[in-house]
Amino acid sequence: MRWFYSTNHKDIGTLYFILGVWAGMVGAGMSLLIRIELSQPGAFLGSDQLYNTIVTAHXFVMIFFLVMPVFIGGFGNWLLPLMLGAPDMAFPRLNNMSFWLLPPSLILLVSSAAVEKGAGTGWTVYPPLASNLAHAGPSVDLAIFSLHLAGASSILGAINFITTVINMRWSGLRLERIPLFVWAVLITVVLLLLSLPVLAGAITMLLTDRNLNTSFFDPAGGGDPILYQHLFWFFGHPEVYILILPGFGAISHIVSHYTAKLEPFGALGMIYAMLGIAVLGFIVWAHHMFTVGLDVDTRAYFTAVTMIIAVPTGIKVFSWLATIHGSKIKYETPVLWALGFIFLFTTGGLTGIILSNSSLDIILHDTYYVVAHFHYVLSMGAVFAIFAAFTHWFPLLTGLTLHHRWANAQFFLMFLGVNTTFFPQHFLGLSGMPRRYSDYPDAFMKWNVVSSFGSLLSFVALMLFIFILWEAFASQRSVISSPHMSSALEWSDPILPLDFHNLSETGIITYPK
């Protein structure tokens, strides 16, 4: 029962991890179904609607039930109080509620796919396809309610994290000195707090359009489906930065830890870069809508500002490289993930720069080029960062160590798998293969076969990861000590795993005058 009503940040963080791992398996299973369908021309599932329902559910599960719970809920809950020297989160019971809103939300999402014909709208849920005309029945409504719950969970969590960071720091721990992961999560939850209400408004209007005969998005009643797209992407674009920013913070910690440095190169610049990304992230949303007939000045503006986001992102990438430069790096598993992250995230960023050109995007929009782009930054950005953070902080969370050689092998297998899956999709997109179709002309077969083979490699790597987890718990190799630098506050308690309540009183940090 302790897990149900726990108000302890470590317990709740662990619950988020369990939910995230489980949902990650579900989402990975869906992605395998997608790749099996596309592994050869002709039908496998036999229905485009079913295929699109799987695509929709895959996306929602991976975004709202894997990346966000693990990074913000799992690592955020576990590490923020430790890095700030706080005894717990500011609102422990609210924290508990934030977690317990997620399982019902996940159940609603799975139900939406299971009842009637499912929500085959894609994760963007655009009307008129999502209207009661094209999607009669309760499926889309269930998906909307699922999003409402997940959004409420995130907003409550955001309030909690913001309050914790502002009020519960060690005396003397000035804002510019708090660790980069704390900054990353703080900026992330501010983005959540500002963008989720807009999504809630959009999907509530969609709900009333579907059930109460309003016409927010129906031209017949004076509405406009483009309004929905503007509202959705005003949330959707900050959302993709919400997914990656905690990863930035984690990678900063890992890179400086394994290069034996007290802090990453240009730590203050890193904070400003994240702030810059956060601000710019709110004013570029229409680059997802270059094909809907925006006028030329609007397209020019969104192209230009989207390209400007590359500047703070580039600052971060080069600062990580500068941190690594000249150091005697210890090639342990988290470093491999971090280096893989830097390389592949940069690749995804470059395809993003290409897509930010409105003229090119009109050709590439809704092709597999876009799929390849965002899977490079998510599947090899956010997910690699999760693996890096998990392998790095696993001894802190459990007091146990992972099997070194197997963890390394799992990285190389996963690296091979995701690249084999997603690199060929750039070629498919450039040849004009569209997204969200369950079948394709024979001309596209070669690269689809390669891509589907890569997905099997990734799946084996995932199973190997689950085995490595089991092996670590089964073997019980305890941590003796941590080789951390004095600036890494979360490791400062000498006894691992950390006690249920590790801080009986808060500390004080003094500075030389």
UniProtKB/Swiss-Prot annotation:
Where do the TM regions start and end? 14-34, 60-80, 96-116, 142-162, 180-200, 231-251, 265-285, 304-324, 335-355, 377-397, 411-431, 453-473
Name where it's found. Answer: Mitochondrion inner membrane
Residues annotated as binding Cu cation: 237, 287-288
Positions annotated to bind O2: 241
Protein's GO biological process: electron transport coupled proton transport; mitochondrial electron transport, cytochrome c to oxygen
Question: What kind of membrane protein is this, topologically?
Answer: Multi-pass membrane protein
Cite the InterPro entries for this sequence. Cyt_c_oxase-like_su1_dom, Cyt_c_oxase-like_su1_sf, Cyt_C_Oxase_1, Cyt_c_Oxase_su1_BS, Cyt_c_oxase_su1_dom
Entry keyword Acetylation = no
Catalyzed reactions per annotation: 4 Fe(II)-[cytochrome c] + O2 + 8 H(+)(in) = 4 Fe(III)-[cytochrome c] + 2 H2O + 4 H(+)(out)
UniProt xrefs under CDD domains = Cyt_c_Oxidase_I
Give the cofactor note text.
Binds 2 heme A groups non-covalently per subunit. Binds a copper B center.
Record's PANTHER family?
CYTOCHROME C OXIDASE SUBUNIT 1
| Similarity-based family | Belongs to the heme-copper respiratory oxidase family.
Official protein name in the record: Cytochrome c oxidase subunit 1
Organism of origin is Lumbricus terrestris (Common earthworm)
